[in-house]
Amino acid sequence: MVEDELALFDKSINEFWNKFKSTVSDTSCQMVGLRETYKDSIKAFAEKLSVKLKEEERMVEMFLEYQNQICRQNKLIQEKKENLLKLIAEVKDKKQEVEALTANIQDLKEEYARKKETISTANKANEERLKRLQKSADLYKDRLGLEIRKIYGDKLQFIFTDIDPKHPDRPFMFSLCLNEARDYEVSDCAPRLECLAEFQEKVRQTNNFSAFLANVRKAFTALVYN
């Protein structure tokens, strides 16, 4: 009876041991499998993380490069803006210079027109006075033996003859012109007359040219008889 119980107990012990070893063996295999799975998961995660980090680095590099490009563009835009402002200032200065030059040209044109009008008026007056001189000369040519010639420098040369009875063709002459003040100016008198300056001043005051010619002829005649 006791032997049977011992045999049964021994059998139970053996069954428990075998079952325990089987359970431990299965658990060990499961642990090894889990460990390998864990390693693979960690490796895959590390690879994914590495790829992600590299992508992040590229993104950072791209961002920095883009930021640098923006800085360069902003600098270039600022330089162009400064150049444009400088150009605008130069254009304004040139415009002011052109306006001043245009105004100056207009003033010169107006001054030229005034001077031209003054010269034209003076020339007309000069022509009228020369016409009067010529008319007076023509009137007295026969009576005074007077010949008038136009010579260099817009001068008129007055030549008297029939003064010296011994030499009727002997010339007595002087030259006449209008100076810048449009006054009579006598020169080149031959023979020389001391009173010529007085006659010149008188004709300037009276504008009586006929009397001037008569006085000059009388003065030449006085030289012959004195």
Curated annotation (Swiss-Prot):
Q: Looking at the keywords, is Coiled coil present? A: yes
InterPro entries xrefs: Spc25 (IPR045143), Spc25_C (IPR013255)
Q: Where is this region: Interaction with the C-terminus of SPBC24?
A: 147-226
Q: GO terms for biological process?
A: attachment of spindle microtubules to kinetochore; cell division; chromosome segregation; mitotic spindle organization
Protein location:
Nucleus; Chromosome, Centromere, Kinetochore
Respond yes or no to whether keyword Isomerase is given for this record. no
Ranges in coiled-coil conformation: 72-147
Q: How does it assemble?
A: Component of the NDC80 complex, which consists of NDC80/HEC1, CDCA1, SPBC24 and SPBC25. The NDC80 complex is formed by two subcomplexes composed of NDC80/HEC1-CDCA1 and SPBC24-SPBC25. Each subcomplex is formed by parallel interactions through the coiled-coil domains of individual subunits. Formation of a tetrameric complex is mediated by interactions between the C-terminal regions of both subunits of the NDC80/HEC1-CDCA1 subcomplex and the N-terminal regions of both subunits of the SPBC24-SPBC25 complex.
User: Which protein family is it in?
Assistant: Belongs to the SPC25 family.
Name assigned to this protein = Kinetochore protein Spc25
As recorded in Swiss-Prot or TrEMBL, the protein's gene is named: SPC25
